């Protein structure tokens, strides 16, 4: 039986899955990074934990290993940020948010998965006999149909009699139809252009990306208050005030600039790029990072130097902490906030906006289209 089906069966039957250091059933280990084999059932043989499964990444059809799949199941109740961080620390390939959700739903039996290929469903009992019986019936029926065709005589009816035998030239009619189709297409195209123009303008809102790292000082819980009101709330405190759990997937905020060239602008803030379309990257103006390169793994520009050539980079730290090496290695700007003295926050945020606006005016390709 396939390893994915064995895992799903073990989950359904609530059986203990054993991680093994070797193919011996007695070599049990606790940590997944120490495991070389995995045992789902005492009646089956241990399976190499790094063997590819039939759970694939749709973008390139690459197969996730059994280690990646099982680790995603073990951390199913953790946030996506914490899961990605642990994958990075252990060197395990991580699944994206949508891939992990899809996998967990399939393992729990609540839905099918488009990421899983080539799994054979078990045949119901008696299916072979039923198929044989059906083949016999079909063969018998085909003989009867052939007999009917051989002994059927075609007769004329009022429809066949009215059919003419003289060939008719429809070229002139075909030309009229083509002219009508082209005229309709031109009208529809002009109407579509009128509808699309305001939509394109609305969709030019610049995008800010946050780091999903658990060590990030700016999260989806506290970023809006920080950038709009100039007040920094520690991430743990902000998450607690919001009732815990994951923050929103998308935040829209307005910023009124002191520079008359900018006026009031609307920014979109997201943490992950799973739902990004290719043209969204033209709208990304800023990336907040913690200095961990795994953050950019699924970005259009996954290499830090290349990324921060195209977007403005910020790295937020507490006052008194040593400057992170990324501030000079990657060309990102360090932003320092006080741990306790909140009266300094507004000035820090004002300086951040000034730096971002200057970058947008000089470097952002879509800036000219917004003026």
From Swiss-Prot:
Domain of life: Eukaryota
Gene Ontology cellular component list: Cdc73/Paf1 complex; cytosol; nucleus
GO biological process entries: positive regulation of transcription elongation by RNA polymerase II; transcription elongation by RNA polymerase II
InterPro entries associated with the record: Cdc73/Parafibromin, CDC73_C, CDC73_C_sf
Keywords recorded for this protein, A-Z: Activator, Cytoplasm, Nucleus, Transcription, Transcription regulation
Localization in the cell: Cytoplasm; Nucleus
A molecular-function term among this protein's GO annotations: RNA polymerase II complex binding
Family: Belongs to the CDC73 family.
Role according to the record: The PAF1 complex is a multifunctional complex. Involved in transcription initiation via genetic interactions with TATA-binding proteins. Involved in elongation. It regulates 3'-end formation of snR47 by modulating the recruitment or stable association of nrd1 with RNA polymerase II.
Complex formation: Component of the PAF1 complex which consists of at least cdc73, paf1 and rtf1.
Protein name, entry field: Cell division control protein 73
Top-level taxonomy: Eukaryota, Fungi, Dikarya, Ascomycota, Taphrinomycotina
Originating gene: cdc73
């Amino acid at each position: 039986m396939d390893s994915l089906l064995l895992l799903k069966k073990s989950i359904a039957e609530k059986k203990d899955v054993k991680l093994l250091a070797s193919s011996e059933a007695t070599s049990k280990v606790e940590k997944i990074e120490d495991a070389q084999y995995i045992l789902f059932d005492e009646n089956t043989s241990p399976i190499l934990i790094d063997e590819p499964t039939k759970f694939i990444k749709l973008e390139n059809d690459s197969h996730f290993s059994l280690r990646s799949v099982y680790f995603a199941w073990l951390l199913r109740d953790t946030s996506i940020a914490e899961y990605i961080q642990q994958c990075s620390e252990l060197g395990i390939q991580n699944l994206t948010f949508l891939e992990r959700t899809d996998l967990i739903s399939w393992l729990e039996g609540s839905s099918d998965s488009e990421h899983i290929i080539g799994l054979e469903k078990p045949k119901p009992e008696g299916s072979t006999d039923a198929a044989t019986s059906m083949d016999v019936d079909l063969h018998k029926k085909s003989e009867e149909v052939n007999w009917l065709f051989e002994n059927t005589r075609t007769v004329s009816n009022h429809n066949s009699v009215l059919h003419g035998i003289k060939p008719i030239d429809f070229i002139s009619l075909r030309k009229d139809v083509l002219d009508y189709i082209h005229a309709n297409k031109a009208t529809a195209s002009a109407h579509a252009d009128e509808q699309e123009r305001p939509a394109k303008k609305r969709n030019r809102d610049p995008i800010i990306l946050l780091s999903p790292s658990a060590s990030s000082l700016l999260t989806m819980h506290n970023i809006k208050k920080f950038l709009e009101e100039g007040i920094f709330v520690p991430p743990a405190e902000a998450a607690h005030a919001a009732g815990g759990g994951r923050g929103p997937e998308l935040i829209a905020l307005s910023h009124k600039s002191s520079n008359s060239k900018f006026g009031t602008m609307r920014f979109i803030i997201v943490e992950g790029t799973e739902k990004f379309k290719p043209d969204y990257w033209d709208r990304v103006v800023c990336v907040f990072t913690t200095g961990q390169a795994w953050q950019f793994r699924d970005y259009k520009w996954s290499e830090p130097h290349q990324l921060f050539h195209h977007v403005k980079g910020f790295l937020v730290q507490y006052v008194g902490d040593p400057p992170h090496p990324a501030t000079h290695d990657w060309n990102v700007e360090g932003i320092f906030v006080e741990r306790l003295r909140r009266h300094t926050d507004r000035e820090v945020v004002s300086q951040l906006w000034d730096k971002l606006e200057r970058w947008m005016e000089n470097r952002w390709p879509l800036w000219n289209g917004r003026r």
